[in-house]
Structures are given as C-alpha cells and as structure tokens.
Amino acid sequence: MEKAVNTNTEVKKATATLRYAMISPRKVRIVIDLIRNKPVQEALNILKFIPKRGARFVEKLLKSAIANAENNHNMNVDKLYIAEIYANGGPMLKRIRPRAQGRAFLIRKRTSHITVVLKERE
C-alpha cells in the first residue's frame, strides 16, 4: 500500500460579493466577460472606459475585493488577478403595467448577485 501524499498548498484568495444589485444579470455578464482572468489594474482601466451601467457596479465591487485582499489576507496588489467573476440572478420584483380593456402585463425588475474572487499569480 502506498501512502497518500499530502499536498496541502493552500492558495490565498480574496472575495467580494454584491447582492441585490438592481440590474439584470444578463446586462452585467456583458461587462464581466471582458475582465475575467485579467490583472486587477488592467481590469480597472477597462471598466473605467466602458459606457455601460453594469461597469460602475463591477468597478466598485472590484475595488472592494482589492481592499479585502490587501487588508484581510496580506496579498500583494501588483500580483492579483481576477480568478473568478460571475453574476447570478437574485429575486425578481414584480410590477404591474396596466393595459387596454382591463388587462395587466407583468413587469419583472431583475436583480443580480455579483461575486469576484481574486488570487495571486506565481
């Protein structure tokens, strides 16, 4: 019988989550697909010049994740990159739009839960 080799090399990671953002996950995914696997400084520069509303949410969240990495995990900011970033749907607010002849259509105000995971490059 062979002994199990213990490869306990724990990788430090810093996360930040924005919950209940009043924007559709589909609209945020357009922005987050542009910065996935990029270094954080490059990602911030990209977000600064994207003329989409979702970019403001993601930029603020990324700055929060960088602060978490620096203060809570003592990580080097220059080596950080975006390992994971995703937007999932949150609860929908349902509203009514009155239509002709007493009908009503449903308006779905979608919310998002956006998560960023940062890791250090070797």
Swiss-Prot record:
Q: Which HAMAP family does the record match to this protein? A: Ribosomal_uL22_B
UniProt function note: This protein binds specifically to 23S rRNA; its binding is stimulated by other ribosomal proteins, e.g. L4, L17, and L20. It is important during the early stages of 50S assembly. It makes multiple contacts with different domains of the 23S rRNA in the assembled 50S subunit and ribosome.
**Which Gene3D superfamilies is this protein grouped with?**
Ribosomal protein L22/L17
Q: What Pfam families does UniProt report for this protein, alphabetically?
A: Ribosomal_L22
Q: Does this UniProt record's set of keywords contain Lipoprotein?
A: no
Q: Name one GO biological process term.
A: translation
Subunit structure of this chain's protein: Part of the 50S ribosomal subunit.
**Gene Ontology CC annotation, any one:** cytosolic large ribosomal subunit
Record keywords, A-Z: Ribonucleoprotein, Ribosomal protein, RNA-binding, rRNA-binding
Please, which domain of life does this record's source organism belong to? Answer: Bacteria
Concerning its family, UniProt says: Belongs to the universal ribosomal protein uL22 family.
Name-wise, this protein is Large ribosomal subunit protein uL22
A GO term for molecular function = structural constituent of ribosome
